[in-house]
């Protein structure tokens, strides 16, 4: 039995490893046209990497969504991510921003009687644009006191003229409208091939361009077998309508996972992360969105 368990784990791990991006040839499936950024996407990139938009300065979106670790936190020995204020932390590990643009808008499926989509593990942001607004004002993240303070910094940023070129000469005079455009530009950047490469070995395998090793194929078989791993029941691995698989169905599940003692040590013994329940009501306590398994070999730690 121990030997079979080891083979199972090794096979599944091999499957996860093939979902990593291949940095050498062959040429990525995304086209060269997708890599050319519009002016709005260029602005979104500037905002995404601007470390001056936190208070105190020093943290940007890219600080916690680093390309080296598939757009998640580079700090892999902590169960939570660090904020710009020394000593402050979030309550979860940073989720990957890769492929997040494909999540459907947060909604309740009356037929299936469950919640689907949205951003964050608890679905508290309806879409990518709304998600982009949150970290700037979160005291445990970028800690800006209000929207106006963010816009004031943008007024003196090197890309202020680009902001006006994209959204109008007077846009920065209205902090509420300007802040909405900040989120729009970041979401637009996150919709580019920079975040959605679809260039893993598994993508090339689906396109018929490479073959899986015997161990990788065994991992895939276990992953999809309803009587064995059945991982694909939630982490979809098939192409649908010509689209590449995203390894999530964007639903919310309660797996009965106990509280992480490392998080309790930081947040207090009484801390409880109720997940979706915080967003829609206590009847959904303990449910969290099914995460994508793309690039999972790079996105540790693998607990919320």
Question: Where are the language model's segments positioned?
Answer:
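Post-cleavage N-terminal segment of exported redox proteins
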Residues: 2-47, 94, 134-139, 143-226, ...
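Short glycine/threonine-rich turn/loop motifs
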Residues: 25-131, 199-304
């Amino acid at each position: 039995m121990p030997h079979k368990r080891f083979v199972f784990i090794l096979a599944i791990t091999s499957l996860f490893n093939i979902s990593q991006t291949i940095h050498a040839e062959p040429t990525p499936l995304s086209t060269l046209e997708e890599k050319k950024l519009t002016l709005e996407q260029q602005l979104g990139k500037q905002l995404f990497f601007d470390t001056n938009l936190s208070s105190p300065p020093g943290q940007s979106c890219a600080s916690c969504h680093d390309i080296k670790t598939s757009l998640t936190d580079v700090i892999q020995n902590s169960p939570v991510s660090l904020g710009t204020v020394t000593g402050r932390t979030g309550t979860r590990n940073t989720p990957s921003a890769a492929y997040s643009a494909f999540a459907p808008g947060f909604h309740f499926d009356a037929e299936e009687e469950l919640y689907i989509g949205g951003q964050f593990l608890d679905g508290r942001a309806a879409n990518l644009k709304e998600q982009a607004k949150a970290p700037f004002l979160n005291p445990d993240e970028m800690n800006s006191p209000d929207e106006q303070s963010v816009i004031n910094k943008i007024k003196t940023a090197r890309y202020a003229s680009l902001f006006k070129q994209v959204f109008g000469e007077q846009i920065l005079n209205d902090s509420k409208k300007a802040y909405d455009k900040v989120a729009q530009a970041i979401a637009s950047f996150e919709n580019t091939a920079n975040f959605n490469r679809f260039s893993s070995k598994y993508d090339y395998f689906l396109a018929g361009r490479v073959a899986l090793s015997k161990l990788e194929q065994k991992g895939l078989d276990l992953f999809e077998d309803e009587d064995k791993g059945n991982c694909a029941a939630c982490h979809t691995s098939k192409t649908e309508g010509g689209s590449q698989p995203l390894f999530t169905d964007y639903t919310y599940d309660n797996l009965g996972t106990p509280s992480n003692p490392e998080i309790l040590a930081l947040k207090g013994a009484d801390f409880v992360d109720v997940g979706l329940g915080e967003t829609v009501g206590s009847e959904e306590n303990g449910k969290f969105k099914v995460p994508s398994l793309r690039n999972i070999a790079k996105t540790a730690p693998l607990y919320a």
